[in-house]
Amino acid sequence: FKFYDHPERLRIPLIKRNGVFEEATWDEAYNFIVSEFIRIREQHGPDALGGVSSARCPNEENYLMQKFFRAQVGTNNIDACARVCHSPTALGMQKTFGTGAATNSIDDLRDTHTIMVIGANPTDAHPVTGAKIKQQIMKGKTLIVIDPRRTELARYAHYHLQLKPGTNVALLNMMMHYIVKEGWVKQEFIDQRTEGWEDFKKEVLSVDIAAMERETGVDRNLVREAAKAYATSPAAMSFHGLGVTEHYQGTFTVMQIADL
């Protein structure tokens, strides 16, 4: 809680004038907001304005937020932070699995043999899950971490694919290329439960590994080893976080994780 009394914490409103933030009273700040809202609405119409609420707000505050924009401002331009964090997961999984929900519970960690964590730092962001993952790794299970950062879990990883930021799609393409090329697939499952296998197979086999290696900055041999560990494991689970979804490739990356 050191941030609470931190000297750099904002305690009074700031209004930018001539490119410089200047201190203002609360009345000045509220009057400025109101006057600008009115000016923009009169000049460009109500749809020139919009609001973004938050899942961290209670129902009452979110209700007031949407009511303000719809009834007072006169626009339906109201959204929430879930648009860039949860929605890519929901859409990606819906397109691949048919529903935007998790396929496993956290308790299934006990029954898995290999765990892949991509774009997530659960020991900091979700300590309970992070602790459960660490417990399983300490029992000898395999951990694959895909993250540009050296997170705490990366210290326990058997394979840390430290890719360049924004290259999730390329790296997952490499993994799928090796899995299909080497035949590390469960063909019976594919035949019975998937569609479009031949088109998918043709696409991933055409991946230029050398180009993907340059793009991601990850050695192809390390990617191949991680892909083999994941694909040949008797049971494997993957976890992804905001490092995947809060990205322009978010939905496509979630779809690739599902394909993997």
Give the ranges of each region predicted by the language model:
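A glycine-rich, hydrophobic/aromatic-adjacent loop/helix-cap motif
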Residues: 230-259
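Flexible glycine/proline-enriched surface loops and loop-helix/loop-strand junctions
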Residues: 156-157, 206-210, 240-244
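N-terminal export/assembly segments and adjacent metallocofactor-ligating motifs
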Residues: 1-182, 196, 211, 219
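Core structural elements
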Residues: 201-206, 224-236
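Conserved phosphate/pyrophosphate-binding and hydrolysis machinery centered on Walker-type P-loop NTPases
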Residues: 194, 220, 246
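Internal, active-site/partner-interface "lid" segment
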Residues: 182-212
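Short coil/turn segments at secondary-structure boundaries
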Residues: 44-53, 81-83, 187-193, 214-215, ...
